[in-house]
Amino acid sequence: MTSYIERLKSAASYLDTVPDEHHDFRKPTAKVVTTQLTIATSLGIFALLSFSILLKKWPRLYASRRYKDDGNLRLPSWNQSSLFGWLTVLYKIRDEQILEYAGLDAYVFLSFFKMCIKLLSIFCFFSVCVISPVRYHFTGKIDDGNDDDDSESSLIHLVKRIVEGSGDGDNHSAPERTNVYLWMYVLFTYFFTFIAIKMAVAETKHVVSTRQAYLGKQNTITDRTIRLSGIPIELRDSEALKTRIEQLKIGTVSSITICREWGPLNKLFHCRKKILKNLELKYSECPRELRTRQPYSENYHLLGNEQSGAVTHGENVPSSNNNDEDTILYSQISLGERPKMKIGYRGIFGKEVDAIEYLEQQLKFIDAEIIEARKQHYSATPTAFVTMDSVANAQMAAQAVLDPRVHYFITRLAPAPHDIKWDHVCLSRKDRLTKVYSTTVFIGLSSLFLVIPVSYLATLLNLKTLSKFWPSVGQLLKDHQWAANIVTGLLPTYLFTLLNFGIPYFYEYLTSYQGLVSYSEEEISLVSKNFFYIFVNLFLVFTLAGTASNYWAYLSDTTKIAYQLATSVKEFSLFYVDLIILQGIGMFPFKLLLVGSLIGFPLVKIKAKTPRQRNELYNPPIFNFGLQLPQPILILIITLIYSVMSTKILTSGLAYFIIGFYVYKYQLIFATDHLPHSTGKVWPLIFRRIIVGLLLFQLTMTGTLAGFEGGWVLSSCLFPLPVVTLCFLYDFEKNYLPLSKYIALSSIREYERDNSTVNSANEEESYAYPYAVSELEGPMLD
């Protein structure tokens, strides 16, 4: 009896300690997760309803590709009177139609989401049916993490302490002994790793085969062209370069464009574009009947003629003199209603002149300058676009080593003509390298600088630290539990959502000045930059939540890394549940609203005064993988890391990818354009980051198992996994990567035999420098 009373006292003393614990933001209660789910669901439903209503009202804004369609795509339609009719149509669109409607890049992007849905569905099944029940049987916890801070889990601990007789307080802090159920962790770490690798490899084979079949049918000028860099000075001439390439017996050259330092011509065209835009605006402000002086041009110029001519004309026709004077007077009055402008500094100072006449003179002047500039000689750069006579010859040339010297005659497949950034192509080698390295260094320094606010944010959101800096706020949170839950449970996810909203656009801006020669190269580079930022800042820095001294300590003693990572991961489990719920259920549906276009549309519509601006008003927004892809990859990595430990994160991640798949599917097919010509080359970036996620998963599980008494035996069982994982990465780099970059000759020859190669609708494109050959168009008037 005394023993039983002692157990009750011990359990009561344990319960007394629960309410007094400071609620760390890394350990939000399950009630906070429920609140987050309610908020996110409400936001998601609101966004879905709003989009469905706005789609009916403004179909040209939210389904702009249907109206831009020239008849070749034949995008599916739905009943406009139905509020949710678009959902059924979207669901029925097959993979082959995605490839037809949105292109190869969109197909690869959505294939990644489909793979994640299949993978997490398998993980969720085993987690719900096997892992969680076994773990609950042995520990009384559904998930392995600090998710037991609410009253329900406290009751579970109370019962276990009474039944097991663990009244000694020392046992609460002692290392947990190794249990039989921990071998389940080892088993499922192996199982989940091999399932993930198997599905990633299977999806790689699928993407590669689809890419080979899709691109093997193409016979466009883009598919026949290579970009040649490192051209020696003596060969920077079209005829000499053509002769040298054909001497190598790799095919016949159809055409060559030597890139030159056309910088002055670029500046003239940029200036002309501004003048043309201002001229069209002034025409739009002018009454239609006064836009041209043609009816009064003769009389208008008479004002500047010699009086003798006018007198002579008047002597012969005296009856018309009064009519001419009336016409001149009318012309002066009418022309006074035309728009005026000052030609001084920024249009504020200087003489006031007729705006249309002045801008037309400026346009004629700069056109003359451009015509003259086109005749000038410009120094050749070491880059050229070489169009071969066949796709097969272009593929062989792109994969061949043409010169024994280093950095000479380097071949790559050429981007599409519309994908080229000619301002960067025209740069000299010195200027381009300066841009590349200076921008890279600046981005690296910016990334390091951003570690500081993130780490401080992670520290300051701790209730103890808040009390130290703001005692009144800390006391308020201690007195009001609901406020503490909001600040330490919900606030971090929203702050990080805001913090990670603007930084990717900042990196996009910096990348545009990096000197890359095509938009597709910028896009792929942006994927790497943004993923590095959110992975380092949102995951590593925020999870470890320490200062620079902590990181150096981890590096000095590498044995601490796995254990510290496992400990931090456990503490952050419900934080990541909150984050994934908010991003997936709450924020994803808002992407359908195209908030930027929605907010800016009324303003842009008001400012759209010229026919050119009105034509561009309903142009679809540009879909940039560099902005959209990094976060889903990070969410997949987080779910992989927690796959054995947290059923909540697995189910949240599954919901994230299901919602994301249909949101992006709609955007890529109906609402946005993807202009860069990257031909599915984003898949290698995805595969490598899946491998990184698996390695972190294995490292975390090693640290988790090592934390138990005698856990070194279990941890040592996982040592082969990283080696096996890296072997699959090596196999991918050696065998699959070339097929992700190039087209196999057998794929090309197969479709050549079938006579089914596709001559693209863009055959009018060429690699001629556009500013050297394009027409000098006049203002567009309505």
Curated annotation (Swiss-Prot):
- Extracellular compartment ranges equal 1-34, 140-181, 462-485, 552-578, 643-648, 703-709
Subcellular location(s) of the protein:
Membrane
According to the record, the protein's activity is controlled as follows: Activated by hyperosmotic shock after mannitol treatment.
Cytoplasmic face of the membrane: 56-116, 203-440, 507-530, 600-621, 670-681, 731-782
Q: Which domain of life is it from?
A: Eukaryota
- For this UniProt record, give its keywords in alphabetical order, as a comma-separated list: Calcium, Glycoprotein, Ion channel, Ion transport, Membrane, Transmembrane, Transmembrane helix, Transport
Bilayer topology annotation: Multi-pass membrane protein
Name the Pfam families on file.
Answer: PHM7_cyt, RSN1_7TM, RSN1_TM
* GO BP term (any one): monoatomic cation transport
Q: Which InterPro entries match?
A: Csc1-like (IPR045122), CSC1/OSCA1-like_7TM (IPR003864), CSC1/OSCA1-like_cyt (IPR027815), Csc1/OSCA1-like_N (IPR032880)
Residues annotated as coiled-coil are: none
- Sites where a glycan is attached: N171
Family classification: Belongs to the CSC1 (TC 1.A.17) family.
Say what the protein does. Acts as an osmosensitive calcium-permeable cation channel.
PANTHER family found in the cross-reference section: PROBABLE MEMBRANE PROTEIN DUF221-RELATED (PTHR13018), RE44586P (PTHR13018:SF5)
What name does UniProt use for this protein? Calcium permeable stress-gated cation channel 1
